[in-house]
Amino acid sequence: MTLSLPQQGRLRAAVECRRITRRFAGQAVLDGLDLDIAPGEFVALLGSSGSGKTTLLRTLAGLEPIDQGQLQVPSAMAAVFQEPRLMPWKRVWRNVALGVRGAGARERAEAALEEVGLAHRLNAWPGTLSGGEAQRVALARALVREPHLLLLDEPFAALDALTRIRMHQLIIRLWRVHTPAVLLVTHDVDEALLLADRVLVLANGQIAEQLPIRLPRPRQASTPGFQALRARLLQLLGVETEAEPAVDISLPLSRTASR
């Protein structure tokens, strides 16, 4: 097993996985998996429950060891999970500044909170936040570290539909500004198509399929090609579908040009 954490300037890719294997009780959850993610690329990962999506993300984050293979990731990375995981005894800005070293920690935390629209909540207690606000704090906590790799483990799954749309808009805007590579783990095919440059399907411990998403941004379900990609991904996931009318779930953005 080789685990390498080179400096970002020496990386040709933000993520390089070569034949990585991770076993639990003798069962290979990741089984000789290969994966590359380019700097600044937004990748979504789909798969059935138990397919190993979260295991892969936790492996990239350094939270799970690998049993075999080679893995290269940047030293500057951050993760946002489905649960915000805020410390209730620390005010919002102190949650954002966790792990930030130097005299400017508060200023950096305040700047990150302003980016996610929560400058007015910097002295609030986490228990007073809505679900969407708490996730925005978690996102600010990730961004304050200026990551070259941002890992998102179903961060929008527990949010209501309107808040999810707003979070989608926010994450795309921040991605365009900060340009990290992003790996989003999700069960939502539409979410993957709305956000990602490339969608991967994980099955049997390996990347079974990958589809480049060349649809113009901002995207919506009625964008030409969206429904065909959706049907293809659902087929790969073993979901039988019938033709349905397109529902407009557009993501209006202030920056409309594609990256």
Curated annotation (Swiss-Prot):
Identify the residues that the record assigns to the ABC transporter domain, covering every copy: 15-229
Task: Report which gene this protein is encoded by.
Answer: ssuB1
What is this protein's name? Aliphatic sulfonates import ATP-binding protein SsuB 1
As for subcellular location, the record says:
Cell inner membrane
Q: Tell me which GO cellular component terms the UniProt record holds.
A: plasma membrane
User: Topology in the membrane?
Assistant: Peripheral membrane protein
User: Could you tell me the EC number(s) of this protein?
Assistant: 7.6.2.14
What keywords would UniProt list here?
Answer: ATP-binding, Cell inner membrane, Cell membrane, Membrane, Nucleotide-binding, Translocase, Transport
Q: Which residues bind ATP?
A: 47-54
Coiled-coil segments? none
Location (main, coarse): membrane
Q: Does the keyword Transport apply?
A: yes
Its catalytic activity? ATP + H2O + aliphatic sulfonate-[sulfonate-binding protein]Side 1 = ADP + phosphate + aliphatic sulfonateSide 2 + [sulfonate-binding protein]Side 1
Pfam families cross-referenced by the UniProt entry: ABC_tran (PF00005)
Instruction: Summarize the subunit comment.
Output: The complex is composed of two ATP-binding proteins (SsuB), two transmembrane proteins (SsuC) and a solute-binding protein (SsuA).
Species annotation: Pseudomonas fluorescens (strain ATCC BAA-477 / NRRL B-23932 / Pf-5)
SMART domains from the entry? AAA (SM00382)
Write out the function statement from the record. Answer: Part of the ABC transporter complex SsuABC involved in aliphatic sulfonates import. Responsible for energy coupling to the transport system.
